[in-house]
Amino acid sequence: MKVVIVGGGAGGISTASNLRKIDKDCEIIVLTRDDKVAYSPCAIPYVLSGTIKSFDDIVMRTAEDYKKKDIDVITEVEVTAVDSKNKTVTYKSKSKQKTIAYDKLVLATGGKPFVPPMDGVELDGVYQIRTIEDGIEVQEAMKDAKSAIVTGAGLIGIEIAFALKKQGLNVTLSEMMPQIVPRSLDKDMSDILVSYLEMEGINVVLGKPITKLIGDGKVEKACFGDEELIDADMVILATGVRAELELAKMAGCEIGRWAIITNRHMETSVEDVYAVGDCVESKDLILGSNTISQLGTTAVRQSKAVARTICGWRSNFNPVLNSMVSKVGKLEFGAVGYTSSFAQQNRIRPIVQKIEALTRARYYPNAKPMDIKVICDSEGRIIGCQIIAEERVAERIDSMTLAITEGLTCFELSNMEFAYAPPVSMVTDPLILAVEEVSKKFS
């Protein structure tokens, strides 16, 4: 069996690795436009901040490493054609063009940065950050810059803004929505983050899109709304990504609202063509509708399902909740499931409780405040959770991910057993305090 994988990101390279673990004999070819594989794009902001020393440190394996596992990773090539009828893929490098056959094809083409429609995006000094090469370019530009604007206040935008500020730049973080991280946090929770960012010296501009970038060949200012101007030696576009669908369309795959449609085995509508990662739509666990889940964790889980399916195991990829966690400076923040505003938009009447607790016993040194928001539906079933604290956020988001996945109500979770010791927790965990409080709203 010959498996060709298009894309060397988290979905593609993980598919190759998982295939090799199951099938020691199949031929595996990975085609990627990057010169590096098996690196963590999520770590790029932390290299820019200086927390991680070098971009080399976030490259886990090279093409040569995969060669030792009998996986042929062909770098710096562009796939130009997919013929699903004759089961061939054509790619070109700097020096040649080649067509190869496949038995199974995996599309892991990822996403491409969304460029907002505004005048001046073609100016020098305007950057997107998707790859290590993008990160290196920004790192070089930072050396001569005094001011920067990051537009788009999702996870990556916030992390990059903080990284630039840590390196001494005057930073403005702009978001056209009236809040930051709008997909994951409600406004009252995101306001906690805004206060922290402003305390750290970042200028946060909300509800005002950048209408144009101004400069003579190189960006000098950004115009917000009709007239507000802010100086900028560099501008980072962190406005999200859109699924890369050209090859999927060429292959004849069914395309949904955002990305490629697959079944739970990661099979597309075309026989022997599969898809994983940012180019794929996923099922929403709560409503069962299609959604987009452009997370590295999603791509890796999909890669396990597709590898098993290709090898005859017919493995399933489960619906998603888009659980996330991040850290800027001292502050960790995470979320899973629905915000109360998203629930309302989807005709769910949310029952909500927000509390403040501590990360450890109140008498123990360095106990940190923890803000928790729990969202339930009208029957008490937990459908969302948001947490902000200086520590211990990720494991509680994971606990709530399991609770939502299992369909637990706030009443059921309130009886859950948690471990306790004064240096690491409260005798009643903050999650239990939160669900106990929201439970009272049903009495």
What are the residue ranges of the model-derived segments?
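Flexible, glycine-rich terminal cap/loop adjacent to redox cofactors
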Residues: 6-10, 20-25, 33-34, 239, ...
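A Rossmann-like FAD-binding core segment of flavoenzymes
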Residues: 25-27, 67-69, 73-93, 100, ...
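Glycine-rich Rossmann-fold phosphate-binding loop(s) that bind the pyrophosphate
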Residues: 7-10, 130-131, 151-154
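Rossmann-like dinucleotide-binding cores of NAD(P)H-dependent redox enzymes
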Residues: 58-59, 147, 156-212, 293-298, ...
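FAD-site-proximal beta/loop scaffold in flavoenzymes
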Residues: 122-145, 217-223, 228-308, 399, ...
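A conserved FAD-binding loop/helix module that cradles the flavin
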Residues: 262, 276-339, 424-442
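Short hydrophobic core segments
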Residues: 6, 100-110, 230-240, 303, ...
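Beta1-alpha1 glycine-rich phosphate/pyrophosphate-binding loop at the start
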Residues: 1-72, 163-185
